[in-house]
């Protein structure tokens, strides 16, 4: 997968204020406020910044957290995971594997088959519905 590396000013021009704050500055949307937290539409969730396929709706589940949650990405290269020591705790940050957009965090409290909960900001995603 070819990487995308753009200056922040370019991203600022292309994204909404909320998307820029979350994806490029590492922000977090309020729980239960995002467009996709309760969506059940079948499809693929893509990175809002670069269009890379990230998560399949087949891996989405209601974690009760208020953010879209998935038990796995579409493939291992779609996302990358980094240690995050912000806010006085240790978490694993999830970023887009292609453009390095901040997506959310992954926690070890998800359902089978992976036991993982990818807790993702709606503003970092764009759902492309499956054709019926």
UniProtKB/Swiss-Prot annotation:
Name its GO BP terms in alphabetical order: cellular response to oxidative stress; protein repair; response to hypochlorite
| Co-factor: note | Binds 1 zinc ion per subunit. The zinc ion is important for the structural integrity of the protein.
Q: What is its EC number?
A: 1.8.4.12
- Gene Ontology molecular function, alphabetical: peptide-methionine (R)-S-oxide reductase activity; zinc ion binding
Q: Tell whether Oxidoreductase is among the UniProt keywords.
A: yes
Per UniProt, Zn(2+) binds at 47, 50, 96, 99
The entry's keywords: Metal-binding, Oxidoreductase, Zinc
Q: Which InterPro entries match?
A: Met_Sox_Rdtase_MsrB, Met_Sox_Rdtase_MsrB_dom, Mss4-like_sf
**SUPFAM superfamilies in the record, alphabetically?**
Mss4-like (SSF51316)
GO CC annotations, alphabetized: cytoplasm
* Stored PROSITE patterns: MSRB
Query: Which reaction equation describes what this protein catalyses?
Result: L-methionyl-[protein] + [thioredoxin]-disulfide + H2O = L-methionyl-(R)-S-oxide-[protein] + [thioredoxin]-dithiol
Q: Which residues form the active site?
A: 119
The record places domain MsrB at 8-130
**Which NCBIfam families does this one have?**
peptide-methionine (R)-S-oxide reductase MsrB
Record family assignment: Belongs to the MsrB Met sulfoxide reductase family.
Instruction: Supply the HAMAP family for this chain.
Output: MsrB
State the protein's name: Peptide methionine sulfoxide reductase MsrB
User: Which organism does this record belong to?
Assistant: Pseudomonas aeruginosa (strain ATCC 15692 / DSM 22644 / CIP 104116 / JCM 14847 / LMG 12228 / 1C / PRS 101 / PAO1)
Q: Which gene is the coding source of this polypeptide chain?
A: msrB
């Amino acid at each position: 997968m070819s990487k995308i590396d753009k200056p922040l000013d370019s991203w600022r021009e292309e994204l909404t204020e909320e998307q820029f704050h979350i994806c490029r500055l590492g922000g977090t949307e309020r729980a239960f406020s995002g467009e996709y937290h309760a969506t059940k539409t079948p499809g693929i969730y893509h990175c809002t910044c670069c269009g890379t396929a990230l998560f399949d709706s087949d891996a989405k589940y209601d974690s009760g957290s208020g953010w879209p949650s998935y038990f796995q990405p579409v493939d291992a290269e779609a996302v990358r995971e980094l240690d995050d020591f912000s806010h006085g705790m240790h978490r694993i940050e999830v970023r887009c594997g292609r453009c390095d957009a901040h997506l959310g965090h992954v926690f070890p409290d998800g359902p089978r088959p992976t036991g993982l909960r990818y807790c993702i900001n709606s503003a970092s995603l764009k759902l492309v519905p499956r054709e019926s």
